[in-house]
């Protein structure tokens, strides 16, 4: 199973350990929806830059911004929305970001689709156990924007800390449906059924990336790689759009 979950304990230990890394290790804090694409990008970057290692911390963008603003030793921040990135910008923790990808929402349901969901409007049924990201997280903010845009009165069964937590609940049949990013469906092919949302009623998130104000020198090279041809090719292979 390609689905990767990162516990808060693991993330805390990771960030604490980064303080002792040498200059050849770049710490990248990235939105959980970037897990698969960035893992592949990191491997490609390391292959092209012998001697440089990439260490990832994947979590909800809002939590990552809080960690960075609190002084966590991070070199690169890639968020799932401009709003989450702006929190780090406003605190002076990061340099000016640039957009590197776009993403939109989809509905994930168990393979057997027990609630017989076929459309966005089906999620308004009180009998449907729906899980979404908490609103401070970009996937949550986007979900509530989606509901408002389509005049849907939604009462989720639970609010999750990041999009991969939402996806996990669907994978293990603890929910009838979850609002995730389209790209997340590529990580669980054969484990969930994806229901696409029409573009005209969907919500598109723009993903920004930047280095922190005290980033290691090679951090800029990683950002250039992500925004360059190789990085963009990998992102598109996972379903991300160009900015």
For the regions a protein language model found, what residue spans apply to each?
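Sec-dependent bacterial lipoprotein signal peptides
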Residues: 1-16
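Central helical "cap/lid" subdomain
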Residues: 92, 96-98
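A structural micro-motif
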Residues: 52-54, 95, 128, 192
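Periplasmic-binding protein-like
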Residues: 75-79
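Exported/periplasmic ABC-transporter solute-binding proteins
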Residues: 18-47, 62, 66-69, 81-82, ...
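Short, high-confidence coil segments that cap the C-terminus of an alpha-helix
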Residues: 51, 73-74, 175
